[in-house]
Amino acid sequence: MKRLLVLTGGGDCPGLNAVIRAIVKRAAQEKEWEVLGSIQAYNGILWEPTEVVRLTPELVRGIHFRGGTIIETTNKGGPFNWPVKNADGTWSTIDRSDEMLRKLQYMGIDAVISIGGDGSQRISQKLYEKGLNIIGVPKTIDNDLSSTECTFGFQTAVQIATEAVDKLVTTAASHNRVFVLEVMGRDAGWIALHSAIAGGAEVCLLPEFPYDINIVKTRLEQRFNHDRGFAVVVASEGARPKDGQQVYEISTEVGYENKKLGGIGRRFIEEMKAAGFSHDMRETTLGHLQRGGVPIAYDRVLSAEFGVKAFEMVLNGQFGQMVAYHHPDVVAVSLKEAVAQPNLVSLDSDLVRTARGLNISLAI
């Protein structure tokens, strides 16, 4: 009996369970394969004792419409930077990758499917270079992997953000206010741009293009002066002003620095007030609401396609590669290519042209 190990790493997102289910159901058609799941990414292998569950068709029945991941996930640590607490209470990290590879060999693992974002797939590439039979499945609601046209969970996150814009429009109009909606997007503003277009926002602030606060002030004052006494601004969490920085905190809780973004909405309002904008402004942060809940139909289908393709890549020995969506096909691309550069919004993209055609300001 051959053994396949499946793990989910990084932040959770809608569609993870649908991928797991698809892998297990496809593997069940090949009688010689057993599928295992490592709890909290690689932690389940590195912990003592190990925490691994057998993923059977019965266990994954009906999980495709559930949010989260039944094998849990983590965005802390990993085989190459495992956190260790020192005697003096400080933290450091060590490389346990060779130890983990020995444990996988001892467990009789023939192949690994890693479902995760850019950080997870960089780990996948490094493990492949060390000889591990590994395949990547892209997962990021930011949609910031350049080797795939879309990642599962992104469309659900856009839907959630768009619904928030719709609701803020009605309350903004009722109170003659400006609402600033902060959505996820560290380096790529795809969620903000899509939801701004879908929801009819007045201004959209993206990480790719530092904004000019005076352009926003002028734009919103013109709107109020023309009897449209309300507006919605959609801002990516990674947006920043010209000659300014992103809003973030540095966390060192597990021995290495982790950059936690958040707070652009609040700072943007402070900047607007400092620039002389006198109208009432409020901010709303969606945060992890974008990661949770039921995946929409599009993401369920894409997740199913990714899961089936990933297992078939295992059968074909296509290790060191990642599943990718190149419309209309699901294909395999090298992990090295997948993590080479991010997928960012460009000024000459159709989506930016559409936003400008709808008179949505990018404040640049």
Locations of regions flagged by a protein language model:
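Short beta-strand elements at the ligand-binding edges of bilobed clamshell
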Residues: 147-158, 293-300
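Short, acidic/small-residue loops that bind anionic groups at enzyme active sites
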Residues: 32, 36, 127-151, 205-209
